[in-house]
């Protein structure tokens, strides 16, 4: 019976429902394998239905509680949930593992999945966990076993690769002193020796884990299992291996459904003469049909765990290695691999599978000469598998690979001279591309945890070297002999840009993959960086394994005191600037009826003031928004537009000033529409283009602004730098003209105050030309604290400077305000209403109609100047 368990994550909870019956029979003549003696010692055995390729035992002594489906063990669906029932002892070792004593308990079964159904999973019934017992689950590309003892509130959990579409043997043992151990296909896969306290694990009155996740969007996964066995003791590793080989028929692969692997014409699982030839052939054929990376990974893992313990010739070892690595390489080319590789556990599991195959090849490699070496290169990796007698090697060290800028060296004295050594080396060509986005908290690198928000990434090839027996190495990094690891860096353009950015600090770690816990974890214990730069690193290590250089880019941060001070300056300065800009706009609006204030220059001042006002108000609001949210993204777009508009109107200010002081380009009316198009139209165009290509770069980092990492910030920086450069050029040209006029006035009239005119003009022009933003360019480095303070102060107070220089201290505005107050005063008097005359700009210049001015300003005293410039033009 291959009962389908229609669950995405199916749970097998063993309940106690004991039927007191015995089944008698006779042993099959073929069942004289010692592994069946291990099976005969079981306390409970359910062979279920006959499965081709899995051997069963018929009990002749009646010592095993044996049953069929719906007798002693049965499957039942309730409300869409498949439940697995058996036995009901309230004080049994099986029901309560804590009562097992020192002998422990063992559970064993064969398991496979059979694809997915299109309909959604029904709602889980209850959704609780069992009070006592264990759980087996397969979900999201990972299998797991959990065991719980309620009396002391302890939980043991271990993860392993799920079975995939082929029969896989899963067995786990538990002892109170040894914890949980999980064996896959007769080999120890993972363990949890210590467990953890879990007092809230389920409810005390719940008997059964209810069968599926509460996820309506997922689809069903058909599962099947066979040969369910319980021993009320923990089997030894030898017993587990013996039973496994007996069940599958002496080293045969696991499934009759495996595509003709090790199958004769009669479909009997027997070993062919060349044990490895069918594996190589099948890998070659299966590679042509690869479609789903997840399924193929499970298939390759089954192959790696089921290789026969037979010797390999050099040619067979070479063919098997090349074929297996080619199959792995083609997985990386599948469309679904990129998404699957985002789970680091999948990538590390693949590396572990490759290590298993290469270790098997090295341990079974035999040759007629003292030194046997099988080496080559594929699209996946360079490899070398060698069996050497160190005393026959004349070199002072063993190096893999022999050529290239990335290699590992072992000193000759580290080898056991009179013992055969097997050496396996792998230099992966592209695996480092999938070793990115590593959270420091998920590693054993203590230094990286100081910057937990900054991810690590592999910046070199992944290189592996294993030697058996292990070389004798110093356990002290200051001693000898030690392993030397030399790796060339392989930075992408983006990584190189981040690493060379002066506002970042780069940390480099000599790291290795630690599989001691059953899962690969990056660590740097026993390794030290001795030298290197941005292109390479050299490490010394006390052990061998998989090595890579990990890099961590950390943005430089100001001290907390500077951060608080700069933040306070920004808040206070922007708030004061907003008030002053409001006052400026109100002043221009009130005086708009006066002819001198109605001209184009003050229209430009008003538009600049409005753009800066809105930008700074939005900036103050953005400080309160959460990055990554929709309001923050909308705010980032608005900030981008209005700050660009502010810069555009600063450019208009510069061009208009240039036209007034240096050249005359035509009437003001003819330039009016161009100025408005430049001030409001160009920024809108830039924002639309930026949104079209980098919409995800708005408000997604640590603030409501453009992303620096994606390069979208250049949609603001490039136009801003252009405006700054142009306006600095205009400021220099205008300053030269003003300086010339001042010098002429001093020569002719001897007026020393004329020299003050240059300084005054520069002070008046700086706020409207935006040249103070140059301090923002100088403040990009975290060390330039003084420029950051200057930038924060000058730009947060831009509105204040505009109000001071272009309202309070502007002679035209003051004169217009005086005239306006007179008009208001005269308007209130009925005596002068009929005789009131229109106001003209002549009054602003201190003259009356028909009369010449009797007082010249410093601008007018130079009769030799090529330009007669009114002071108000500045």
Curated annotation (Swiss-Prot):
Impact after mutating residue 268 to N: Does not affect subcellular location; does not change G-protein coupled receptor activity
Start and end residues of each GAIN-B domain: 371-557
Consequence of changing residue 448 to D: Reduces cell membrane location; decreases G-protein coupled receptor activity
Stated consequence of mutating residue 713 to A: Strongly decreased G protein-coupled receptor signaling
Effect after changing residue 656 to A/D: Strongly decreased G protein-coupled receptor signaling
Effect of residue 869 to I: Does not affect subcellular location; does not change G-protein coupled receptor activity
Effect ascribed to mutating residue 640 to A: Increased affinity to 5alpha-dihydrotestosterone
Signal sequence residues: 1-25
Effect the entry attributes to changing residue 550 to A: Abolishes G-protein coupled receptor activity; does not affect subcellular location
Entry's transmembrane regions: 568-590, 602-623, 633-655, 674-695, 711-732, 758-780, 784-810
Outcome when changing residue 150 to W: Does not affect subcellular location; decreases G-protein coupled receptor activity
Effect of residue 594 to M: Does not affect subcellular location; does not change G-protein coupled receptor activity
Result when mutating residue 560 to H: Does not affect subcellular location; does not change G-protein coupled receptor activity
Effect of mutating residue 764 to M: Reduces cell membrane location; decreases G-protein coupled receptor activity
Impact upon substituting residue 397 to Q: Does not affect subcellular location
Control of this protein's activity: Forms a heterodimer of 2 chains generated by proteolytic processing that remain associated through non-covalent interactions mediated by the GAIN-B domain. In the inactivated receptor, the Stachel sequence (also named stalk) is embedded in the GAIN-B domain, where it adopts a beta-strand conformation. On activation, the Stachel moves into the 7 transmembrane region and adopts a twisted hook-shaped configuration that forms contacts within the receptor, leading to coupling of a G-alpha protein, which activates signaling.
Domain notes for this protein: The Stachel sequence (also named stalk) in the C-terminal part of the extracellular domain (ECD) functions as a tethered agonist. In the inactivated receptor, the Stachel sequence (also named stalk) is embedded in the GAIN-B domain, where it adopts a beta-strand conformation. On activation, the Stachel moves into the 7 transmembrane region and adopts a twisted hook-shaped configuration that forms contacts within the receptor, leading to coupling of a G-alpha protein, which activates signaling. The N-terminal domain and autocatalytic activity of ADGRD1 at the GPCR proteolysis site (GPS) are not required for G-protein coupling activity.
Subunit architecture: Heterodimer of 2 chains generated by proteolytic processing; the large extracellular N-terminal fragment and the membrane-bound C-terminal fragment predominantly remain associated and non-covalently linked. Interacts with ESYT1; interaction takes place in absence of cytosolic calcium and inhibits the G protein-coupled receptor activity of ADGRD1.
Protein name from the UniProt record: Adhesion G-protein coupled receptor D1
């Amino acid at each position: 019976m291959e009962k389908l368990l229609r669950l995405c994550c199916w749970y097998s909870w063993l309940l106690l429902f004991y039927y007191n019956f015995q089944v008698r029979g006779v042993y099959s003549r073929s069942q004289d394998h010692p592994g069946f003696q291990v099976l005969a010692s079981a306390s409970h055995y359910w062979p279920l239905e006959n499965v081709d390729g899995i051997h069963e035992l018929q009990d002749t002594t009646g010592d095993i509680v044996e049953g069929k489906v719906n007798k002693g063990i049965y499957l039942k669906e309730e409300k869409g949930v498949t439940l697995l029932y058996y036995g009901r002892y309230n004080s049994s070792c099986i029901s309560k593992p804590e009562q097992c004593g020192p002998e422990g308990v063992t559970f064993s079964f064969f398991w496979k999945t059979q694809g997915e159904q299109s309909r959604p999973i029904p709602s889980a019934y209850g959704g609780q966990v069992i009070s006592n017992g264990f759980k087996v689950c397969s979900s999201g590309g990972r299998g797991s076993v959990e065991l719980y003892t309620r009396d002391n509130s302890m939980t043991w959990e271990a993860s392993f690769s799920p079975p995939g579409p082929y029969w896989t043997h899963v067995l786990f043992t538990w002892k109170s002193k040894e914890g949980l151990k999980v064996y896959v296909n007769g080999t120890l896969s993972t363990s949890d020796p210590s467990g953890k306290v879990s007092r809230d694990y389920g409810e005390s009155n719940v008997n059964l884990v209810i069968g599926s996740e509460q996820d309506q969007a997922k689809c069903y996964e058909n599962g099947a299992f066979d040969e369910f066995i319980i021993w009320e003791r923990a089997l030894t590793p030898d017993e587990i291996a013996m039973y496994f080989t007996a069940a599958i028929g002496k080293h045969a692969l696991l499934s009759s459904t495996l595509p003709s692997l090790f199958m004769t014409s009669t479909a009997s699982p027997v070993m062919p003469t060349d044990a490895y030839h069918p594996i190589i052939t099948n890998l070659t054929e299966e590679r042509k049909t690869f479609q789903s990376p997840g399924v193929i990974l499970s298939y390759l893992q089954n192959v790696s765990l089921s290789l026969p313990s037979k010797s390999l010739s050099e040619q067979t070892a070479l063919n098997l290695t090349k074929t297996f690595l080619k199959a792995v390489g083609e997985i990386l080319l599948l469309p679904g691999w990129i998404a699957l590789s985002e789970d680091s556990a999948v990538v590390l599991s693949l590396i572990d599978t490759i290590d298993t195959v290469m270790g098997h090849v090295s341990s079974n490699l035999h040759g007629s000469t003292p030194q046997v070496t099988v080496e080559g290169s594929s699209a996946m990796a360079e490899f070398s598998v060698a069996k050497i007698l160190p005393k026959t090697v004349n070199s002072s060290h063993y190096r893999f690979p022999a050529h290239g800028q990335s290699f590992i060296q072992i000193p000759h004295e580290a080898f056991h001279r009179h013992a055969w050594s097997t050496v396996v080396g792998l230099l992966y060509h592209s695996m480092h591309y999938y070793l990115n986005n590593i959270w420091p908290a998920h590693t054993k690198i203590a230094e990286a945890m100081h910057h937990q928000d900054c991810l690590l990434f592999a910046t070199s090839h992944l290189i592996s070297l294993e030697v058996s027996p292990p070389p004798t190495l110093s356990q002290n990094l200051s001693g000898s002999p030690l392993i030397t690891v030399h790796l060339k860096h392989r930075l992408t353009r983006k990584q190189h840009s981040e690493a060379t950015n002066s506002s970042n600090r780069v940390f480099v770690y000599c790291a290795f993959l630690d599989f001691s816990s059953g899962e690969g974890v990056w660590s740097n214990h026993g390794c030290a960086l001795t030298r290197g730069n941005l292109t390479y690193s050299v490490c010394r290590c006390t052990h061998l394994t998989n090595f890579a250089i990990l890099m961590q880019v950390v943005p430089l941060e100001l001290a907390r005191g500077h951060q608080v001070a700069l933040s306070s300056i920004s808040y206070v300065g922007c708030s004061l600037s907003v008030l002053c800009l409001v006052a400026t706009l109100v002043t221009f609006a009130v005086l708009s009826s006066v002819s001198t204030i109605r001209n184009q220059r003050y229209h430009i001042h008003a538009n600049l003031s409005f753009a800066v006002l809105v930008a700074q108000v939005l900036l103050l609001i953005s400080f309160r928004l959460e990055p990554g949210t929709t309001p923050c993204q909308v705010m980032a777009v608005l900030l981008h537009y209005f700050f660009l508009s502010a810069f555009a109107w600063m450019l208009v200010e510069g061009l208009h000033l240039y036209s007034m002081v240096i050249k005359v380009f035509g009437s003001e009316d003819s330039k009016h529409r161009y100025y408005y198009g430049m001030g409001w139209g160009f920024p809108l165009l830039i924002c639309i283009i930026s949104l079209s290509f980098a919409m995800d770069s708005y408000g997604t980092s640590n603030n409501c602004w453009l992303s620096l990492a994606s390069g979208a910030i250049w949609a603001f920086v490039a136009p801003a730098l252009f405006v700054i450069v142009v306006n600095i050029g205009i400021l220099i040209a205008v300053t030269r003209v003003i300086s010339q006029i001042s010098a002429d006035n001093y020569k002719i009239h001897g007026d020393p105050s004329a020299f003050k005119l240059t300084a005054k003009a520069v002070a008046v022009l700086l706020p409207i030309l935006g040249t103070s933003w140059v301090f923002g360019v100088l403040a990009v480095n975290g060390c330039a604290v003084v420029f950051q303070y200057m930038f924060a102060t000058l730009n947060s107070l831009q509105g204040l400077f505009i109000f001071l220089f272009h309202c309070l201290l502007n002679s035209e505005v003051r004169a217009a305000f005086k005239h306006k107050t007179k008009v208001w005063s005269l308007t209130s008097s009925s005596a002068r209403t009929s005789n009131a005359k229109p106001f003209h700009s002549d009054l602003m210049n201190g003259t009356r109609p028909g009369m010449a001015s009797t007082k010249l300003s410093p601008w007018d005293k130079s009769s030799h100047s090529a330009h007669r410039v009114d002071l108000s033009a500045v």
